[in-house]
Amino acid sequence: IVNCAECEPYITADYRRMLENPDELISGLKVVLQLFDNATGILAIEDNKSDCIQRLEELVQNEPRIKVVALQTKYPQGAERQLIYASTGRAINSSMLPADAGCVVDNVETLISIHRAVITGKPLMERVVTVSGDAVNEPGNFLVPLGMNQNELIEAAGGFKGEPEKIISGGPMMGFAMFTTDTPVTKTSSAILGFTED
């Protein structure tokens, strides 16, 4: 199952990847499917991303082992257990792992990285990060090298509109408050959000 849900508000990094790198996404999924003889690949996307659904359906129409599943847009649709249930109808409880339901869940950025590593020989050196929130001058998505200082990334987005009340790494629901942005972008950095109010 490819987690294309990206259900947290403000984060659009995977959305941009699906629009701009769909071939690499599908190629990465095909690499993973080679590891499992009888597996089916599911691109699980919330139904508010109709442009991605349409594009990915076009690209997999001749791929018998891959299908696109449109999911209801709701939080926390992208959480692993909810995603598995919504995509396959298989329920797993908190003591179970996805493998207990016969599933592997990967995200968009991971599969693109798999494609690049296996097909092109390029190691994981960059990722897309969303910089957004009402305290950000020019919100957007940025393809940046791992290790880049997050202050530089914020400057690339035009900086903050004054001193933000709160800065969050990740989404507003599952992310965490940052006390400093003088830290590097890592492979798990999906977003930097700046807000003027709590």
Segments and roles (model prediction):
Residues 15-16, 38:
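Conserved "landmark" site that anchors the functional core of diverse proteins
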